[in-house]
């Protein structure tokens, strides 16, 4: 029986890892399963086996317990979290599920951006704080930021938080058009799937 490895993926790093493992190990040695959240309509298919959607069990329970049920049912030998850095909930559930079941767990992280002396960053703890900053800042300095453009590359799930910033114009990079695309007059949506060339950026 081959060992089974589950990759929580959807990121470039997850695709690269799946491709590397499938090329290095035979099916008799290792079964590589990539789990995609199902947020994009036509996701790129990673190497190996693929499952799409949340981890709900027969009772409709998702989250940590749904993931644990899947890990047990499929006899997963190793869990790899290669999700997006902003995917806080699944990351928390994955660590808790693997720890409680005593399944080996790896977190594949991407190196953070490094602030250079000439950079001007405004650092906030989360999306809600970023949206609130835009609201407060435009109130203090309306002439400077009023109707200026804000570039969002945060995925579709966090977009609703920024709808309250109605004094700003948004340019949103997205893989699939979100429901906000039809009702958010202050936003322009640019559809595309990375990785992007320097010219595309």
Spans of model-derived segments:
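N-terminal basic/disordered segments at the start of proteins
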Residues: 3-39
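N-terminal beta-loop-helix "entrance" segment that forms/cooperates
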Residues: 32-58, 180-187
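Hydrophobic, well-structured mid-protein blocks that either form specific transmembrane helices
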Residues: 103-170
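Histidine/lysine/aspartate-rich catalytic loop segments that bind and position anionic ligands
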Residues: 162-193
């Amino acid at each position: 029986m081959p060992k089974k490895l589950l990759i929580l993926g959807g990121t470039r790093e997850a695709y690269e890892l799946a491709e590397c493992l499938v090329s290095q190990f035979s099916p008799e040695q290792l079964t590589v399963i990539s789990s995609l959240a199902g947020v994009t309509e036509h996701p790129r298919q990673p190497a190996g086996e693929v499952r799409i959607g949340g981890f709900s069990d027969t009772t409709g329970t998702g989250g940590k317990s749904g993931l644990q049920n899947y890990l047990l049912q499929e006899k997963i030998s190793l869990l790899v979290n290669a999700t997006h850095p902003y995917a806080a909930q699944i990351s928390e559930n994955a660590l808790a599920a693997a720890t409680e079941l005593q399944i080996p767990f790896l977190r594949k992280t991407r190196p953070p951006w490094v602030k250079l002396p000439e950079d001007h960053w405004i650092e906030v703890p989360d999306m809600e704080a970023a949206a609130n900053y835009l609201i407060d800042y435009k109130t203090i300095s309306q002439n400077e930021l009023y109707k200026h453009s804000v570039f969002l590359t945060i995925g579709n799930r966090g977009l609703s938080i920024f709808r309250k910033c109605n004094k700003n114009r948004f340019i949103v990079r997205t893989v699939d058009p979100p429901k906000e695309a039809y009702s958010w007059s202050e936003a322009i949506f640019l559809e595309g799937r990375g990785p992007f060339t320097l010219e595309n950026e």
